[in-house]
Amino acid sequence: MWSRMNRAAEEFYARLRQEFNEEKKGASKDPFIYEADVQVQLISKGQPSLLKTILNENDSVFLVEKVVLEKEETSQVEELQSEETAISDLSAGENIRPLALPVGRARQLIGLYTMAHNPNMTHLKIKQPVTALPPLWVRCDGSDPEGTCWLGAELITTNDIIAGVILYVLTCKADKNYSEDLENLKTSHKKRHHVSAVTARGFAQYELFKSDDLDDTVAPSQTTVTLDLSWSPVDEMLQTPPLSSTAALNIRVQSGESRGCLSHLHRELKFLLVLADGIRTGVTEWLEPLETKSALEFVQEFLNDLNKLDEFDDSTKKDKQKEAVNHDAAAVVRSMLLTVRGDLDFAEQLWCRMSSSVVSYQDLVKCFTLILQSLQRGDIQPWLHSGSNSLLSKLIHQSYHGAMDSVPLSGTTPLQMLLEIGLDKLKKDYISFFVSQELASLNHLEYFISPSVSTQEQVCRVQKLHHILEILVICMLFIKPQHELLFSLTQSCIKYYKQNPLDEQHIFQLPVRPAAVKNLYQSEKPQKWRVELSNSQKRVKTVWQLSDSSPVDHSSFHRPEFPELTLNGSLEERTAFVNMLTCSQVHFK
C-alpha cells in the first residue's frame, strides 16, 4: 500500500512539474489527463470567482476537475441534470459546466500533492530540494455532509524552502437556517489557529442594474452594474456597510442594451459595421429595414422635397431632421439625456434614410445614381457642414461650380461613400453628447474622431466611443451619479480605450464615496455579504459568505422543502446560499 502511494505521489508531482515547466516556456495551454478520470490545467487568469477571496488575481494555480465525458455519456448526464441549477460567475451564459470529483478522490489528490512537497519524505524519488509548485485546487461534488465544493493546498515557503502547507476547505449549501453568530466565528477561528486576536473585514455587493432577460429568442444581455463596499471592523453579521467603507462601482455594459435609450443610434452603428465588413471581406450581411418603402422611393421623396425649395433654410432643415429621427423620439423623451441635433446636413439626413432602408448593393447603386444625377443637373444645391472629407461632400462642393468628377458606382465605391457619411454623422452625434454634458472636450476625443487613420480603424474607434456612451447613459438613467463621478468614469473609459481593443465584457471600476451613493444601498439588501476573519498571519482566513445565487459553477444543491428566502428584497423569492472557507496550517519541520 505504502509503495503504491509513494509511487503515486512521485508520478503526480512529476506530471505537475512538467506542466509547470512547459507553462513557463509558453508551450502548454491545454489540460492534461491524470489516471484517466482527472484533468489538470495550470491557469493564471479566469479563476473561479469563489477562489478570488483567497487568491491574487494573477496567481497561477493548478485547477483539477473530472475528465469531461464522451459525447454520448455527456448527453445522458445533461438530461439528468436539466432541471438542476448552477449559476456560474466564471462562465456566465455557457451551457456546459465543469465536472467535479468525488470528495474522497479530491482528498487523495491533495494528499499526494502535500506528500510530494514534504521535505521529510526523503525516500521519494523526487530531486531535492523539492521545487515548490503553484497551489492545487480541486473541484468537489459536495457529496459529503458538509457540502464541500473545493479543496485546496498552498505551500508555505521561507527563503525558497518549503516549510509547510495551508489546506483549504470550501463548502456551499442552500440553507434557510443560515443564521450565524459573529462571535462564534471568531472563537472558532481563534481555536483553530491558536491566536488571541482576530480582525474582521466585511464585504457587501449590491446589484444596482441587471438586464431583464424577458425574451428567450435573443441572447441575454451581459449588462450589470454593482456596488462593492468593504470595511473593518465588522460589528455584526449582515451589517449595513458604514459610510467609512471603501466603495467602488463595477460597470459592464453590452451595447444595444434594451433598457437604455440608444437603440436607434446602436442600429446606425451596426449598419456602419455592415458596410465596413462588406468592404473588408467582400460579403455584406444587410440588416432588416426599418422602413416599408424601398430605399429608392425613400431617397426620391427626399430629393423631391429638396427640389421644391428655393433654398435649404434652417426651418426646413429642422423639419427634415425631425422626420429622419422620429422613430427615436420616444427614447429621447424618456431619457432627456440625448438631445437630437438640430443641424443635420444633407449628407447626414441622407444617411438616416439610407441606413434604415437599404437592403442590397443594388439599392446603394440606384440611390447614389439618383443623387449624382440630381447634383449634375443642378436640381438641388444641398447644405453641408464644413470639414467633411467624404467623397460625396467633395462632389457636392464641385456641383456648386457646375463641374463634377465622374465617379463609377462599382466595386466597393458605393459602400465606401455611404460609410464615409455615416462616420461623419456618428462622430458629430457623439461629440455633441460628450461636449454638451461637459464630460469630455474635443481634445479628449481626438483619438476617437481623428480622420488621419484608415477608414477601418476609424470604424473601430467610433465603435469604442459608442460603447463609452452606452456605459454613461446606463449610469445616468439608473444610477444617477453626480457629475464629478460621471466625468471620472468618462475619463477612465477614454484612457482604457486609447490603449485597448473593444471589450464589452470589460468591467470598468469607479471608486466612489459611500456618502455619494448611500441612497442606492442603505435601504436595500445585498446580493452578496461576506465577512473575512484573519489574524497577523494574513494567509490564514475564515470566510463566511451569504449570496442570493450559487457562486459554485460545478455543483447543484439539494433545496430543502421550505419557502425560499428573499435575500435581494425583490418580489421574486430566492434560496440563500451559504459558503464557508476554513483552513489549517501543516508545518513540515
UniProtKB/Swiss-Prot annotation:
Classification via InterPro entries: Zwilch (IPR018630)
Membrane-crossing residue ranges in chain numbering: none
GO cellular component, one term: RZZ complex
Any coiled-coil regions, as ranges: none
Pfam family, one: Zwilch
Compartment annotation: Chromosome, Centromere, Kinetochore
GO biological process, one term: cell division
Keywords in alphabetical order: Cell cycle, Cell division, Centromere, Chromosome, Kinetochore, Mitosis, Phosphoprotein
Modified positions (Phosphoserine) in chain numbering: 88
Record-stated family: Belongs to the ZWILCH family.
Record note on quaternary structure: Component of the RZZ complex composed of KNTC1/ROD, ZW10 and ZWILCH; in the complex interacts directly with KNTC1/ROD.
Function: Essential component of the mitotic checkpoint, which prevents cells from prematurely exiting mitosis. Required for the assembly of the dynein-dynactin and MAD1-MAD2 complexes onto kinetochores. Its function related to the spindle assembly machinery is proposed to depend on its association in the mitotic RZZ complex.
Protein's name in the database: Protein zwilch homolog
Native source species: Mus musculus (Mouse)
Upper lineage: Eukaryota, Metazoa, Chordata, Craniata, Vertebrata
